[in-house]
Amino acid sequence: MGLTSAATDQTIHRVLSLLVPQQQPPIIPMAFTYNEYGEDIHRLFVPADDPGRSRIPSTDLVVYNTDKQLLQLQSQAAGPSPVYRDEFTLVVYIDGACRGNGTPQARASYGVYFGPGSPYNANGLLPTTVRQSSTCAEIEALAAALNTIHELCTNDLKLMFIKIATDSKFLVDAMTLHIEGWIEDGGIGSRGKKVIHYERMKELHELLDDMEYSDDGGMIVQFWHVDRSLNEGADALANAALDA
């Protein structure tokens, strides 16, 4: 579904809260990706569908802000305009790892990557009370990322447009295409069976709604499906947790 007026109002509130003029205006990430019903999927980020990023090579799209110690998107206005770092964005890479996946000895971990040497980078093992699987690891990586993102954006009102990059197509599809339908159907999937990990994903979906629509929200969080080769930072963190 598209952005609601409530989400737009909260985003405008964040913009008006900025006291320091910016050299570059924010580029609002318009949703040009649609589902089979012609509805825009506002939590899905596809650079090729974004006019502010479609002409920027993938290798140049994300840059590290050494002052803020986090990753941000590059942007480019229409025409022969220079590329500049979009100060209103935040890019976070997440990944999960599981050794012995599908066995009683399985052990899973997560990694959250904000950039090279960033103090916000995080990793850890999944609690033993949580199912040890690759899918659970990806979901818990998202949970860890959202906690840090919320804290960062609360302390820095410039950070409004959040991109969560992951190589897990399951997670991207679940959180952008399916979760609202699953909620409407009480957690039952298209095959008439309970969706695995539904309760945890519903909890994170509600957190995303709170970050977007609540009085202190105004953040627009989108999921970005990336190739594994672009997710090496988060992957390394997840595996480091297993090696420790």
What is each residue range found by the language model?
Residues 1-2:
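N-terminal targeting segments with Sec-dependent signals, encompassing both cleavable signal peptides
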Residues 236-244:
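Short, surface-exposed amphipathic charged segments that create phosphate/polyanion-binding patches used
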Residues 5, 13-19, 32, 101, ...:
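RNase H catalytic domain
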Residues 15-17, 29-136, 148-152, 241:
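RNase H-like nuclease fold core
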